[in-house]
Every structure is written in C-alpha cells, then in structure tokens.
Amino acid sequence: YVIAQYDAAVAYMDACIQQILEKLAALGLEEDTIVIFTSDHGETLYDHDCYFDHHGMYDCTLVVPLILRWKNHLPAGLRIPGYCQLKDVTPTLLDIMGIDVDLPFEGRSLKPLIEGKPREAEPEFYITECTWMRKHGWRTPEWKLIVSLGPDFHFKPEVELYNLVKDPEENHNVAEENPEVVEVLKKRMYAFIEKREK
C-alpha cells in the first residue's frame, strides 16, 4: 500500500509537470524559458534500513536528477555522465544565457560538458546533514566517509566508510578494516571544515 501511494505521488507530479510544459508551449514561451528539474534530496526506498525517508548521506538520498530544458538553445536528450552538484546550477544558467558576473561561485558551469568538452571532475568534496540527524561526510571517487555527530536514529555506527568502487550501493561498512583510510579522510574533511568556518 505504501509503495502504491509513493508511485501515485510520482505519477501525479509527472502529470503536473506535463501541464506546465504544455502551458509554456501553448503560450509560445518554450524558447524564452529555461526549465530546471531537480530536487533537494532523493529517497530511501527500503535502502539502509530506512523506509520512505530522506535522511542520511547515502547516494540514494544524495543523487538527484538535474534536467535542463531550453528549446532550441540546449540539445534535447543529451545525457552527461558523472556527477555535478546543485552548486553548479547558478553558474551554469548564467553561462548558457551569456551573462557575465563578477562574483565568485563555489560551483562550476556545466556548459563545457553540454558542448562535449572535457571538464575535470571535482576530486573530493564535503557532504553534510544538519537536520535531526547531524552528520559530516567526505567523498572521493573511491571512498565515502560518514561521521555522526550525535545519536543515529537508525542505529548506524558513529563512523561509516564505504568503498564506492567495490560497493557502490554502500551496503558494507569497512571502517574497522580500513582505519588508515578513515584517518586520512577525516583529516581532509576537518581541514575543509576549519577553512570554511574562518
């Protein structure tokens, strides 16, 4: 029953989005309107002992779609492999609209990727959750470290480490078997936090 409700909510949202797109077309605004589909979080659907929740720092809650639609300005159906972050949206929009601003952004434009040009991936980055579950994390292409700052309501250990190459679904915590990796990633993460808070 719960799955059917979730599926119905997704179908309802699809129908609402279709109405918006049809209205833009009817008003002749498709070429003057950039439409962005994204989300602030994914969902745990039986993942990691969490049921229909969106807390935690596993990829099922962190990875969300980012779809840009701008008729006759952006290529339709183009899929870009890899990942970007929501901090990349603003610099991307300004870049594709040709708006130059003299402001620093943490994010980077996706326009080179849209044009088929290479862009070096961000090698590692900080992730956090600041809701009723307070956690810090550090992600590299190979590893994800999660450090809980308080009690975990899903009874997870204080430190989690996942090998994203061997275990992309993050099912096997290997923190105890890799204490040296935990320490290296913790140092990088805390150095970033200290720099950010200055």
Short names for language-model regions:
Residues 1-5, 70-74, 165-171:
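Short glycine/proline-rich turn/loop motifs
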Residues 1-33, 96, 183, 192, ...:
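A long, amphipathic alpha-helix that forms part
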Residues 3-13, 29, 56-64, 74-91, ...:
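A short beta-strand-to-alpha-helix junction
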Residues 17, 35, 40, 65-66, ...:
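Generic structural signal for small/hydrophobic residues in well-ordered secondary structure
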Residues 22-78, 85:
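Histidine-centered active-site microenvironments of extracellular/periplasmic hydrolases
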Residues 41-47, 88-90, 95-160, 164, ...:
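C-terminal cap/loop subdomain of S1 sulfatases and analogous C-terminal strand-loop tails that border
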Residues 65, 69, 189-198:
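A short, conserved beta-to-alpha structural element at the edge of catalytic cores
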Residues 172-180:
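Active-site-proximal N-terminal segment of extracellular/periplasmic enzymes that hydrolyze or transfer
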